[in-house]
């Protein structure tokens, strides 16, 4: 359960997206990790190549060029409270050149509310010095240094990026002016209780190489007019997706060849399939074809200095329901800095005197402000709330703002993605109690314990409640690690009766270390759940966490049974697939438990909160299915590298996995052939032919046989099959309407000639031969020279294209052909298969595709097979990195997004634990840190249904006691009668899971037999499975008619049997 893809694209409000202070002086102390880490890894920067094994998932977000620029950037993080340590953690994981931690303050009790690398024994010690060795463990490529001296100009000039957190405004302005004048990029971040602030100044001339990080789009051209401007029309298979202002280039245009290889040209979109370009009136006539591709053109952006931007700010809106709030908070934060400067402390929690003083200061700041930022009506209630919570320090707010700030540091270093221009303000006031009278100054007083920063905001009652919570965390990957860290900081399950149960059956891999920050290199191969649990116990020794290694699903319902779920207060998903998410959603709906759902995809993330009897569930809305590639496109007419990579994956399965599995079943299961013959379409023929090939026609005895097979297969796929295709459809073939057959999405292929000196050809043979040998338990070889020499002696039969071979042009044609099977051929195959008795002890070894092991030949085969086919069809090839992304279906991931998303999840957790009942208190969220874009909306209410005058939602059900007072169980007849008398509903169909227990069209004899049988006996008979002892109730689905005979929609039945 590692990286977690976006669970769903959620509805969001708003328009479409467009692109403690360091006050105690101390002696300067400089402690540095060795320049070459002790594990022998080289430092980042030009000295070393990128470690693709470690940075794999992040590279799919940033790309190699941005990653290289990141590795040449030294970063200073000033302020090592909760926010500073979050930012430092994320940029160290990200792989910058070096990080220096600066803090002149000592650890206080309140810091432990969110500073996860401080421990209780560190109270009174310098925060930077204590944090340095723990942060240095995160990434051995990044030297981490602690510095406790003043921020003087000579010191600052050694950094490419400076990050200030929890810093007085006076120091911000001084450092900001110096950085702006010297071309040093500046990020200022601050959190105050439920409020956050972020500012960026990346200089007067920053080059932005890619504003959104999306893959460049491409489309096929069907027409270009000779006009001023020329109008391009794309094939209507799919919308082109371009926007006005994009730059594009053309290739493979026939006729109007002037477009090919031209400089990127700006376009204006006219419609979903059309756009205009330059003056084409003097170009040649367009004939056919062409590919238009989006080109990312670097552009310059300019930032104002902190002092200038403070007076005339530009804001990024985080919540369109709070559109005017950033300008109000801009005034409020300036007033707060004045208050802290005058008193040496923030306003006291819930203190009315301090709140009134902050309001007065804010009014004075507003009065002095320039007209552009001056507020006609200062929101005094908002400023008062800022005063109430400003002394607080919350881990979820720090996680959110820290994730954003770290992403801005990466933008500053790499020039990749659009920076925040220039101020961002955020608040989560919905987390406060719905009853405004609950919190008092006494309840929010500091108690000299690790939760002081949180108690200052929410009071001691919520802290006690958090400690007693019992939560089930499903997954200990990237999101799971961040959730556990936040749980430990806020004190979830840390008190009497509290507990966190985390389950994950995966082990730790090297590629996890870049974002699953609870794991270290020495943890590789250990279980994720055990390791993560041990790591958070170091962060908060009071946390009561139990680790499991179980997959959630029907198979583990004896473990996660009624007792288990009924004892829970809620569930948090940290899953990486939709099926498991939907399963957990069903369980939470059934047991009526809150569910916290989230996911990430690169720089995108989403959060959904599911509240019993209030919101819809996760499964209530679903994304449209992903568009699949037509089979005929894969088999005969590819036009994109995605097509050849999918073809290569299918080849892998069809050569090295499925035949071996089928052979083993044939040899061990007497009913295998009988079962195979019952398969649909041409599947029986395909399966039995594969078994025959594996056991008779192509069974190798030696390594040399495997190399010969690989060479022959190369000729079949890249020469013979292409020649047959061109025999059926010659390059000059016309369709019935007179148009060229090879046009539009159909690219005319050409056969390849095998060349042992071509590295790609030899790559294919080496990989295919080794994998083929492995399926037979034979020993392979990595000696390329020996294989190359042997290949010169391999005799390849001459191939002549045959007449009468049917090649299907469309999937519809293929389906029609598959409807008929040659029975005589099937009988012939059955007769030629060797008897299993004649092969005692023989078995084959199916290979499961594993993308992350570079020594197993899996990706070698995929890359070679795909790129050779791409060469057949003149499709641009893909390198190993891109091929692994597409063929391995890798989910791009980066630590910054994960941190920000989990921060939002835990803000919803505060509301769930308090029991908020107003729908608008909750926030579903969507973000894209690359744009940057933030969208929040209140969850949708659970849809309401009705039968008679009875309203119901997905959270309602019929409760039926299966055991009657006399101890006997209800029969089917009694069950039907119960609904007719109690609910005036006539059941027409009744099912349990996939088993149909009753229907009105059931044969009379079967119905008569079942009516007098107990319900559980019917379930066991129909499902052919005995009910486990852990099963206390069954879920039954009904189709019903009302008294007038009309169909009515009704809830499910919870039928209790124990």
UniProtKB/Swiss-Prot annotation:
GO terms for biological process: DNA damage response; protein ubiquitination; ubiquitin-dependent protein catabolic process. ATP binds at residues 478, 504, 515, 528, 576-577. The modification Phosphoserine is found at residues 4, 13, 21, 24, 46, 810, 816, 820, 835. Residues 63-611 are annotated as: 2 approximate repeats. CDD domains: Ube1_repeat1, Ube1_repeat2. Detected in erythrocytes (at protein level). Ubiquitous. The modification Phosphothreonine is found at residue 800. The active site is at 632 (glycyl thioester intermediate). Keywords: Acetylation, ATP-binding, Cytoplasm, Disease variant, Ligase, Mitochondrion, Neurodegeneration, Nucleotide-binding, Nucleus, Phosphoprotein, Repeat, Ubl conjugation, Ubl conjugation pathway. Its main location: cytoplasm. Its EC number is 6.2.1.45. GO terms for molecular function: ATP binding; RNA binding; ubiquitin activating enzyme activity. SMART domains: UBA_e1_C (SM00985). The modification Phosphotyrosine is found at residue 55. There are two active sites within the E1 molecule, allowing it to accommodate two ubiquitin moieties at a time, with a new ubiquitin forming an adenylate intermediate as the previous one is transferred to the thiol site. The first 11 amino acids are essential for phosphorylation and exclusive nuclear localization. Catalyzes the first step in ubiquitin conjugation to mark cellular proteins for degradation through the ubiquitin-proteasome system. Activates ubiquitin by first adenylating its C-terminal glycine residue with ATP, and thereafter linking this residue to the side chain of a cysteine residue in E1, yielding a ubiquitin-E1 thioester and free AMP. Essential for the formation of radiation-induced foci, timely DNA repair and for response to replication stress. Promotes the recruitment of TP53BP1 and BRCA1 at DNA damage sites. It is linked to Spinal muscular atrophy X-linked 2: A lethal infantile form of spinal muscular atrophy, a neuromuscular disorder characterized by degeneration of the anterior horn cells of the spinal cord, leading to symmetrical muscle weakness and atrophy. Clinical features include hypotonia, areflexia, and multiple congenital contractures. VEXAS syndrome: A sporadic, often fatal, treatment-refractory inflammatory syndrome that develops in late adulthood. Clinical features include fevers, cytopenias, characteristic vacuoles in myeloid and erythroid precursor cells, dysplastic bone marrow, neutrophilic cutaneous and pulmonary inflammation, chondritis, and vasculitis. The disease affects only males and is associated with de novo somatic mutations. This is Ubiquitin-like modifier-activating enzyme 1. It comes from Homo sapiens (Human).
């Amino acid at each position: 359960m590692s990286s977690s893809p976006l669970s769903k694209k959620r509805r969001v409000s708003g328009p479409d997206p467009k692109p403690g202070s360091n006050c105690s002086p101390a002696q300067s102390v400089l402690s540095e990790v060795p320049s070459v880490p002790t594990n022998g890894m080289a430092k980042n920067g030009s000295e070393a190549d990128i470690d693709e094994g470690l940075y794999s998932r992040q590279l799919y977000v940033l790309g190699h060029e941005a990653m290289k620029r990141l590795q040449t950037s030294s970063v200073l993080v000033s302020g090592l409270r909760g926010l500073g340590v979050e930012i430092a953690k994320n940029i160290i994981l990200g792989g910058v050149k070096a990080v220096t931690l600066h803090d002149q303050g000592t650890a206080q009790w309140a810091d432990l509310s969110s500073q996860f690398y401080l421990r209780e024994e560190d109270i009174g010690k310098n925060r930077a010095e204590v944090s340095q060795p723990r942060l240095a463990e995160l990434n051995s490529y990044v030297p981490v240094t602690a510095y406790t001296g003043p921020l003087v100009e000579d010191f600052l000039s050694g950094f490419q990026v400076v990050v200030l957190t929890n810093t007085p405004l006076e120091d911000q302005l001084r450092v900001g002016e110096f950085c702006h004048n010297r071309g040093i990029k500046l990020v200022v971040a601050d959190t105050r209780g439920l409020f956050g602030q972020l500012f960026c100044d990346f200089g007067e001339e920053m080059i932005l190489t890619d504003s959104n990080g999306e893959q460049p789009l491409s489309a096929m051209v069907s027409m270009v007019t000779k006009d001023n401007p020329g109008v391009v029309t794309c094939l209507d298979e799919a919308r082109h997706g371009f926007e006005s202002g994009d730059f594009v280039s053309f290739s493979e245009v026939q006729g109007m060849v002037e477009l090919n290889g031209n400089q990127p040209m700006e376009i204006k979109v006219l419609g979903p399939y059309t756009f205009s370009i330059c003056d084409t009136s003097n170009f040649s006539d367009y004939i056919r074809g062409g590919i238009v591709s989006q080109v990312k053109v670097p552009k310059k952006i300019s930032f104002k200095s902190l002092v200038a931007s403070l007076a005339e700010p530009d804001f990024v809106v985080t919540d369109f329901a709070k559109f005017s709030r950033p300008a109000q908070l801009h005034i409020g934060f300036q007033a707060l800095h004045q208050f802290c400067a005058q008193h040496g402390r923030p306003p006291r929690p819930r203190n009315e005197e301090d709140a009134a003083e902050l309001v007065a200061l804010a009014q004075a700041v507003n009065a002095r402000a320039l007209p552009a930022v001056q507020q006609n009506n200062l929101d005094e209630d908002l400023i008062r709330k800022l005063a109430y919570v400003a002394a607080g320090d919350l881990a979820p707010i720090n996680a959110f703002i820290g994730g954003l700030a770290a992403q801005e540091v990466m933008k500053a270093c790499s020039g990749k993605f659009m920076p925040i221009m220039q101020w961002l303000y955020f608040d989560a006031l919905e987390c406060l109690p719905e009853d405004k009278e609950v919190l008092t100054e006494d309840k929010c007083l500091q108690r000299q314990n690790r939760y002081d920063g949180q108690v200052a905001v929410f009071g001691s009652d919520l802290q006690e409640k958090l400690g007693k919570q019992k939560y089930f965390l499903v997954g200990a990957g990237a999101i799971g690690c961040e959730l556990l860290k936040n749980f430990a900081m806020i004190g979830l399950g840390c008190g009497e009766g509290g507990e966190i149960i985390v389950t994950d059956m995966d082990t730790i891999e090297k590629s996890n270390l870049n974002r699953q920050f609870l794991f270290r290199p020495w943890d590789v191969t250990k279980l994720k759940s055990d390791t993560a649990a041990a790591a958070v116990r170091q962060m908060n020794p009071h946390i009561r966490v139990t680790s499991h290694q179980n997959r959630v699903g029907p198979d583990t319902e004896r473990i996660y049974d009624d007792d288990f779920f009924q004892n829970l207060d809620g569930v948090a998903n940290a899953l990486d697939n939709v099926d498991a998410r939907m399963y957990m959603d069903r369980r939470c709906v059934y047991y009526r438990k809150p569910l916290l759902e989230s996911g990430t995809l690169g720089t995108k993330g989403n959060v959904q909160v599911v509240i019993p009897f209030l919101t819809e569930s996760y499964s209530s809305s679903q994304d449209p299915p992903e568009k699949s590639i037509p089979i005929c496109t894969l088999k005969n007419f590819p036009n994109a590298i995605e097509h050849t990579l999918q073809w290569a994956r299918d080849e892998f399965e069809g050569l090295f996995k499925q035949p071996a599995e089928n052979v083993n079943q044939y040899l061990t299961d007497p009913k295998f052939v009988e079962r195979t013959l019952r398969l649909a379409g041409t599947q029986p023929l395909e399966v039995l032919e594969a078994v025959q090939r594996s056991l008779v026609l192509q069974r190798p005895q030696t390594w040399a046989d495997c190399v010969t097979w690989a060479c022959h297969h190369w000729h079949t796929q890249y020469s013979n099959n292409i020649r047959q295709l061109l025999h059926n459809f010659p390059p000059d073939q016309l369709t019935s309407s007179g148009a060229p057959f090879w046009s539009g999405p159909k690219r005319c292929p050409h056969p390849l000639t095998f060349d042992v000196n071509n590295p790609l050809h030899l790559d294919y043979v080496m990989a295919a031969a080794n994998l083929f040998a492995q399926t037979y338990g034979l020993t392979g070889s990595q000696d390329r020279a020996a294989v190359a020499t042997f290949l010169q002696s391999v005799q390849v039969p001459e191939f002549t294209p045959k007449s009468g071979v049917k090649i299907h042009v469309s999937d519809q044609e293929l389906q029609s052909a598959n409807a008929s099977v040659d029975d005589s051929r099937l009988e012939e195959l059955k007769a030629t298969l060797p008897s299993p008795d004649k092969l005692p002890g023989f078995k084959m070894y199916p290979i499961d595709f594993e993308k992350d092991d570079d020594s197993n030949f899996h990706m070698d085969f995929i890359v070679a097979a795909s790129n050779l086919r791409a060469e057949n069809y003149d499709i641009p090839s893909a390198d190993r990195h891109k091929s692994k992304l597409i063929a391995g279906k890798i989910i791009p991931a980066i630590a910054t997004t994960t941190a920000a998303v989990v921060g939002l999840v835990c803000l919803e957790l505060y509301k769930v634990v308090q029991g908020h009942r107003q729908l608008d208190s909750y926030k579903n969220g969507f973000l894209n840190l690359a744009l940057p874009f933030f969208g929040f909306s209140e969850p949708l209410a659970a849809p309401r249904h009705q039968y008679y005058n009875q309203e119901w939602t997905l959270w309602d059900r019929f409760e039926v006691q299966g055991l009657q007072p006399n101890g006997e169980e209800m029969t089917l007849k009694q069950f039907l009668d119960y609904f007719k008398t109690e609910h005036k509903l006539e059941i027409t169909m009744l099912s349990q899971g996939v088993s149909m227990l009753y229907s009105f069209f059931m044969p009379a004899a079967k119905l008569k037999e079942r009516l007098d049988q107990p319900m559980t006996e019917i379930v066991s008979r129909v499902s052919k499975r005995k009910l486990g002892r852990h099963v206390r109730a069954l879920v039954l689905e009904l189709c019903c008619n009302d008294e007038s005979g009309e169909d009515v929609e009704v809830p499910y039945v919870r039928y209790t049997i124990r």
